[in-house]
Amino acid sequence: MVNVDTKLLVIFVELLSKRNATYVAEKMHMTAPAVSHSLGRLREIFDDPLFIRVPHGLTPTPKALELGPKVREMLDLWAAINEGDIATFDPLEAAGTFNISFAGTLGDALFDRFLLRVKRLAPGLQVRLTESSSWEADVAAMRSNELDLAFSPFPTRHPEIVEEVVTSFNMWVCARKDHPVLKDHCSLDQYLECEHIFIAQGNPGTRAAPSLIPLDYALQQRGLKRHSTMTVHAWRTQAEVAAQTDMIFTVNSLMKDLVCETYNLNAFPLPSELETVLGLNMLWHRSRNTHPMLVWARNLFKQVVAEYTGKASIAPMHPPMLTDDSGKSGKTGKGDAEKEDESRLSV
């Protein structure tokens, strides 16, 4: 039986993820020769080259790809042993900082409610909610334990990230109450006739998103396109402009009621030809899959979503999705996800 240093396995996982020894050395605060020495030791242990040098880094051997999920599972189990049991987690005794990031296009109403619940149940936690600047920044922050949970309309399929689609929802069209075109419904022709206020998407390409969001893709398939007049940074600006002009905007159902009540707007279902279902993706780093506080927080978020959307419960249909290093999706053993929905956000 070979005695393997846990740090060697961590280096193996990082090499499998980054495929660049220099990046791994920087992340783990090691020298490049030290990483090379560790790789040599791993090759001896597993009797395989594991990684082949190529012009732009390393490429894993079939043996390395086969070992990847097993080594990750072993490290996750070891982390769970060190972290303790969720059954013994007491939110009243919890301390530290709880960091959450969300894509601005989702709106903040649901997350504000979630944070209030966290503070009520775990008063000792410092809670920090920020709007995501980029997907790369979120992954880097989760990797360094500076970000606990992230929420996005886009699935990631990133090898380091566990993702769960918590719920799905539809899109609505918002306009001022005395709008000259949208009076009691919104047809496709009316939708295209109006000028639209878009919300800035940031860089969707970094989130494995298509070049067009589903709503605009559906229009393109028909040879159609929305008339974009203005692009703003937040839903509040969309609503303020729409309340004073004939411009309209499209919002998800989680935000619809708040938007309409606050700014005295009407909301109409998206034209049936363009009906788009969205997914709310909850994301976390796989190294913290069994962290007691985060397991508690994820379950609490799903409870808040169930209350907010009017559902009695959110029944798991599929477990959270893990992406292995070959690019295929797999599933973790303790699922707490609703039906997986790979829809992206439409605005």
From Swiss-Prot:
CDD domains recorded: PBP2_LeuO (cd08466)
InterPro entries found in the cross-reference section: LysR-type_TF, LysR_subst-bd, Tscrpt_reg_HTH_LysR, WH-like_DNA-bd_sf, WH_DNA-bd_sf
The record's annotation in Gene3D superfamilies points to: Periplasmic binding protein-like II, Winged helix-like DNA-binding domain superfamily/Winged helix DNA-binding domain
**Residue ranges annotated for the HTH lysR-type domain, each copy included:** 1-61
Ranges for region Disordered:
316-347
Keywords attached to this Swiss-Prot or TrEMBL record, sorted alphabetically, are:
DNA-binding, Transcription, Transcription regulation, Virulence
Q: What result follows from mutating residue 347 to A?
A: In strain: AW1 and ACH0158
According to the record, mutating residue 100 to V results in:
In strain: AW1 and ACH0158
MF-aspect GO terms: DNA-binding transcription activator activity; transcription cis-regulatory region binding
Q: Does the keyword Transcription regulation apply?
A: yes
User: What does UniProt give as GO cellular component?
Assistant: protein-DNA complex
Give start and end residues of each DNA-binding region. 21-40
Its domain of life reads Bacteria
Q: Spell out the PROSITE patterns in the cross-references.
A: HTH_LYSR (PS50931)
Q: What does changing residue 185 to G do?
A: In strain: ACH0158
Q: Where is the composition biased (Basic and acidic residues)?
A: 325-347
What is the purpose of this protein? Answer: Regulates the transcription of one or more of the genes involved in virulence.
What's this protein's family per the entry?
Answer: Belongs to the LysR transcriptional regulatory family.
The molecule here is called HTH-type transcriptional regulator PhcA
